[in-house]
Amino acid sequence: MLPLEHKASGRVQATGRGVRASVELSSVLPQQRAAQLQHQKCNTGARLGRDPRRGVDAERTLVCTAATTASVPSTSGASPSGSQLSSKALRPRRFSAPVIARLLRSTTTVQELADLVQQQSLYMDSSHVGIAMLHLALLVSRAEQQAAAQLQLQLAAKQAATRRAGSGASTSGRARGWGSGPGRNGSGSSSVSVNGSGSSSNGSSSSSSSLAMGMQLSMASIGDDVVSGVNAGPVPSGGADALLDLEMSSILDDDDGAGARQLQQMSDDLAAGLEAAATTTAAPEAGVAAAGGTGAGAAADAAASSSAPSLVAAAAAAAAAAASPASSPDVARTLRTLLSRAFSLGLDSLSGPQLAAVFTGLAVLRRPRQQQQQQQQAGAAGAGANAGAGGVGGVGVSAGDRLVAEQLLAAMGPKLYECRPQDLANTLASVALLGLPPDADLRTSFYAAVRQQQRRFGPRELATTLWAYGAMGTYVQEDAVQLVLELSRARLTSFSPLQLAKAVQGLAALRYRPSPEWVEAYCSVLRPALRRMSSRELCAVLLALASLQVGLDGGTRAALLVHTFSGPLPGMAPGEVALSLWALGRLSAVDMDLPALIDLDMSGRVLDLTSRLLAAGGFSGGELQQLLEGLTRLALQPPLEWMQAFVAALQPQLDKLDAQQLAGVLNSLAAQQYRPQPQMQEVVLAATQANMKQLLADTTCSAALLTALRRLNIEPPPGWVGALLEESRSALKNRCTDLHLANLAGSLAAWGVRPDGRWAARLMWRSQVLMNEDRMSPRALVALLQAMVSLGLSPNPVWTQLCLQAAVRRASQPAFEPHHYGTLMASLHALGIQPPQEWLTRMLLSTYRCWDRFSVTHWSSLLPALVLLKARPPREWLRRFEATSAARLADCSALQLLTLAVSLAQLHQLHAAGAVADTPLLLPGAAAAAAAAAPAGASSAAAAGDSPAALSAVPAAAGDGALVPSFMSIDDDGTAAVAAAATALAAAEPAAHAATSTTTATAVAHPQPQLLPQAQALPQPGPEWQAAWWAASTRLLLRVRYAPSELVLTAGWLGSLGLRPPPEWLQACAEVAARYSKVMDAAERQQLAAAVAPLALEAVAPPSAPPAGAASTAH
């Protein structure tokens, strides 16, 4: 770079059209030069006349020549007149205010600006301080851009050479195609940049160099966190969970959707410096930057994925060098001088725009950079550069910078009404960039200023404001967000792709779900803008939409999926491929229909692309975790060869992953039904045990790990379980959510671990707190009850009362699924809890809400549990069940038919009896003792209620603890509960069969006739339901779907319930018995004959009139 005086001389010679005499700097003394300048000024004004453009050029020529007189020789290069200028001490000359402003804007290096500020700092006014601050930030940003671009190209070349030497020509060809070269966003995406012309462009122009643009505005890109910041671990399923940390690589841009703007007046230079400052601190422009990442952080990422130690060291050194321009002594000295001048002038004397300019420049130059350097060093060391990315201002500014910024904010608050929309947006973004929590007065003043100038807010200001709101987090007023959303809704059609990404990413970071109308308008603009989006912007949009959990229309879903798979995905870098698939996977968690849009051709192309990248070794450890998780969420099941290549690429990088990433990898492998090798299991268990405290701090990651271990049938060693119990004590105290609590208890139950009393007490206490605060979801409540049954825990009356209240409160909500009813009631019985009849009635009435969603499996689980709890359903409930379930009996199995028939008959008997005591907590043991102590000679009414064999069979057996449901995972649909209920029915033999059976087969074959009229007098289901049941059972008999044991059990229960089988059922039963006689021994044949004989006798016996209670109960 030429020194200042040489450059000024060149400008003087370039304006020869209006200047006759050339300036000879090597021979003219400063005093003579001043007089000559005055003479030239007069002659130039006379010649140029009233031409404003030529007048400005000539005046600028004189100003630059005068600056040469007072300038100190620069160290950036040798001056032709340096010997003569250094021989005499030059006295700084005071320039006028317009001259100082134009000189500040005309400097092209930090050294020139520093020299000028040092000379003219005493003569600067408030406007000069703002101009100098913004221009300093612009020059530093350009220097960082050039260093980052050069670094990126060097590292890409070294990495390509290393891959070529290690993997051969074919592998190196793929590495060059995916890891180096400019403009790798593919044909389907282009970078939006500033055009050099004054006319507006079509919105999709190619990128150009910032040096060629001069003072033109540059486009700010999405921060590095879009590509690298999300690798901190697995993302929580379900919502909510953890959005990528929004680190603003730039607070200024000129991507206003209408193309570029060219500076045509000198008064716009301030806005130019403001909008162009720091645009390239984290990302070079698309024409130079590599698609794998931008800036020093992406370069360190690329170096970390390479196995060559020399590249790792080079990346670390280059990353430190790329961050050096902002921390150079010249920048620090100039910044200190400008701030001192601003405070000496008095902050009260500065206007609102001037304060905004000073504050914005300070934010760009003094934003926290330590965190970026730590990430780069971690990536260079191979410890996972992408782990643990923090939010804005995570490291924080220094105490001195924070004090200065707070004073500037305090002075700016009352003057925000003077600022333009552009100043307001940049000020808010600067606050977020520095990580300063604004006070209530500043938020109120900013909100009032936005409302005052809401008509002047353009797309650029609206997008920047939303992005800044997301970076600020909780320090945002809801009214302010709603105002910006209302303003942006009408202007979304003017948003550029970058601004669309900024807006939705800010809302996602703020966790603010916009209205459906705003989402509809956003989607209508997003679909045509996808073609102009870069890969980084597309990833940001996908992640934000998935985090917001907004409902997208079918056209937008299809456009996002098809565009990503067929457009930019083949041209993306490996890291962007993994991130795009991971983002689409998160979006599919919100929209369950998204995986159905992937056809075989699309899935084949994706698997082939990722297979080639796996063979080339282009993925880092965190990217591998993202890749597999994204494919799993998209319901893509890779072949065995792909999984083997994935595990081979992951094996060398296991030691680089943290506990969260290991949990995510293991959970994805479990979802793909791929059991890892024992060596990999040991590495995962050892790493998670060493970081158990960190793992349990993230409840989502710990739940994913526990679920993966259970799904893969991996039983951890006792040391690992001991560490889990020890570190989970504090989590049980104050951090565990409902699902995490249930998952933790269920995992211990599945591994057969019985925790100590203190751990169990904390489990009960934490669950009691969650139920008391109404934070226990139905899914977690049911799973927790099952885990408590398996762990052998006994709840106290207070916990039981809260549990019943939480269950009946949640039963009226849509989250309470049909399978929750049966599992909940069976678990209550197994825990020894007897709910009151009022509670049971309210639970049964709540089933009307989801009655149509009950299947045969759900009914087969619920009805036996109601019998065990001695529930008395309302007559209307029984009628409705018979009317709706009669048509579904044809889909039942033999065991389900038996379960429904026995349970429904006993529920009719319980309803007719109406003699069960309504005690809040009646243990099954006490109920059994009360039934045993009842007098033998009871009345007929009591005999029809408590003493009948069919009524006392299942509850008496359950009183001994016969039904203990096995542990069921949170995602189970109730199959385990059905099996448990069927086991209980099979274990409890019919009372009539048990009372008449003896050790000899002859005694079994002769039932007592006096029991038949008593059985026929019992309440029974309606005739229509019985006819449907007999038809379904006969159909199964004709198809030989009854096992011998099921046939014996069915015949015994039918005789005990007093049901009269039709002749066709008896004929089919006889044919099945004849078939089974060939494979059954003598004892089994005698048992089958003894079970069928009472049914044959009952079929030929004359029917007796049912009692009044039975008739009223039936229909």
Curated annotation (Swiss-Prot):
Residues 69-90, 163-210 are annotated as: Disordered. One of its GO terms (cellular component) is chloroplast stroma. The keyword Signal does not apply. Residues 176-186 have a biased composition (Gly residues). Keywords: Chloroplast, Plastid, Repeat, Transit peptide. InterPro entries: FAST_kinase (IPR050870). It is found in: Plastid, Chloroplast stroma. Residues 69-87, 163-175, 187-210 have a biased composition (Low complexity). Residues 483-1068 are annotated as: 9 X 38 AA approximate repeats. It comes from the Eukaryota. Sequence repeats lie at residues 483-521, 607-645, 685-723, 724-763, 764-803, 804-842, 843-880, 990-1029, 1030-1068. Part of a 400 kDa complex which is not stably associated with RNA. Required for expression of the chloroplast encoded psbC mRNA, most likely for translation initiation. Interacts with the 5'-UTR of psbC. This is Tbc2 translation factor, chloroplastic. It comes from Chlamydomonas reinhardtii. The gene is TBC2.
